[in-house]
Design a protein with these regions (language model features):
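Conserved active-site tyrosine of GNAT-family acetyltransferases
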Residues: 24-29, 95, 124
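Short, contiguous alpha-helical
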Residues: 122-128
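Vicinal oxygen chelate
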Residues: 2-12, 34-82, 92-120, 131-132
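Active-site-adjacent beta-strand anchor residues
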Residues: 17, 81-84
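Conserved beta-strand-loop-alpha-helix junction that forms the acyl-donor binding cleft
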Residues: 15-21, 111-112
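Short, conserved charged micro-motifs
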Residues: 23, 87-92
Length: 132
């Protein structure tokens, strides 16, 4: 097996590009319980336990020329924002309390043995929570 000698730790830090960073941040805080680590209208870093979980970036911000096309209506076609949850039952209660749109679930995925809930996230993205 080929292994890169310079790679010590790899942590995903997905960036979601949205029109309204502040509204998307509020959704992730309200529904997933994440914490604002930056705040602002152009960029947000959302954390859990001090670790970055997801980044939000505004379409029109200039410093990243390869974010995509804001005029393309597809949001994450083929890409899902997937989060592991320690307390899946608590998450489902919270989803109900926040009136989050549930697309599917809760269901048991026979391949992973995990329960899943697929919900509508900000600006049309699909967010999946999975847990025991």
């Amino acid at each position: 097996m080929l292994r890169c000698s310079f790679v010590r730790v790899v942590r995903p830090q997905p960036m979601v590009v949205v029109a309204d960073v502040e509204a998307a941040s509020r959704w992730f805080q309200r529904v997933l319980g994440l914490v604002s680590g930056h705040g602002g209208s152009e960029y947000e870093s959302l954390t859990d336990g001090g670790e970055m979980v997801v980044q939000l970036h505004r379409w029109e911000a200039d410093e990243h020329p390869h974010l995509g096309d804001p005029n393309e209506p597809s949001r994450g076609n083929g890409v899902l924002l997937w989060f592991a949850m320690d307390d899946f039952d608590g998450f489902m209660r919270h989803v109900e309390e926040t009136e989050t749109v549930v697309l599917d679930g809760p269901l048991l995925n026979p391949n992973s043995g995990q329960r899943e809930a697929w919900v509508r996230g900000p600006e049309g993205y699909v967010v999946v929570a999975a847990g025991p």
